[in-house]
Amino acid sequence: MKPTAIFLMGPTASGKTDLAIQLRSQLPVEVISVDSALIYKGMDIGTAKPSKEELALAPHRLIDILDPSESYSAMNFRDDALREMADITAQGKIPLLVGGTMLYYKALIEGLSPLPSADENIRAELEQKAAQQGWAALHTELAKIDPISAARINPSDSQRINRALEVFYITGKSLTELTEEKGEALPYDFVQFAIAPQDRHVLHERIEQRFHKMIELGFQAEVEKLYARGDLNINLPSIRCVGYRQMWEYLQGDYAYEEMIFRGICATRQLAKRQLTWLRGWKTPIQWLDSLQPQQAKETVLRHLDSYQKG
């Protein structure tokens, strides 16, 4: 019999953390974060990282594990999450995975085809080609090989263009083809919940309010500190995080303060829309919860889990 795991998914600003804290007070669970932004140290305000008080009530694994200069893949997450889940299960508890990075959940459930290690010779050739023709030309080349990846990658994002082309030159397969090849399935029985306000206008209002709250809490100073380091740039996954990118571009002088706020809110709403699109197309059953009914949401999870465990 496989051990049980609980997934608590949902768009940004939907109330996942609050519900996770409530669940931990009533269930033998330990929380694992499923969030590609919370992994970074020194990025607290703009990621809406749980506060010290919240973490005291419900410690989260897989937050604050990397410096913003480092990259982290869905494969990295799967390895780390499986290790943490095994540790939690060994303690006789249930892993409660909480977050909105849907690609991480997909990787965890379905497994991933391992991607090849970097080839410095190929990378050097691509760098040389880019120096002569520009990264936009290499992006055009990528679009012919792998239009799906090219559509997701900004033409100026040299790091991701290089990697996508490198993978193709090493394997003869596109990055999209390789990531669609399934690996080892998840060795857990998992119950899935998704929390969101039933009224999308409420979610949009929450996102706007949260962004303004981040500004009040010192988000600009947080990004200024990262900017002043000198070793970070806008092509890094950390700085591409929603909100950070817009504040970074403002600090670079790309646009005015009010424009930065507008763009930050719009980008966060677009993120929420993408997360909801993922969830609506999810292949395995999800129990939906209403953010506006937190007590009912908690009771639904407890009731559903009780009946699930009884079989």
Swiss-Prot record:
Known catalytic reactions: adenosine(37) in tRNA + dimethylallyl diphosphate = N(6)-dimethylallyladenosine(37) in tRNA + diphosphate
Gene3D superfamilies: 1.10.20.140, P-loop containing nucleotide triphosphate hydrolases
Record: residues binding ATP: 10-17
Binding-site positions, substrate: 12-17
Residues under site feature: Interaction with substrate tRNA: 101, 123
One Pfam family per UniProt: IPPT
SUPFAM superfamilies in the record: P-loop containing nucleoside triphosphate hydrolases
Cofactor: Mg(2+)
Region (Interaction with substrate tRNA), start-end ranges: 35-38, 159-163, 240-245
Gene Ontology biological process terms in this record: tRNA modification
Entry GO MF terms: ATP binding; tRNA dimethylallyltransferase activity
NCBIfam families: miaA (TIGR00174)
Assembly description: Monomer.
HAMAP family on file: IPP_trans (MF_00185)
Protein name from the UniProt record: tRNA dimethylallyltransferase
UniProt source species: Haemophilus influenzae (strain ATCC 51907 / DSM 11121 / KW20 / Rd)
Lineage, uppermost ranks: Bacteria, Pseudomonadati, Pseudomonadota, Gammaproteobacteria, Pasteurellales
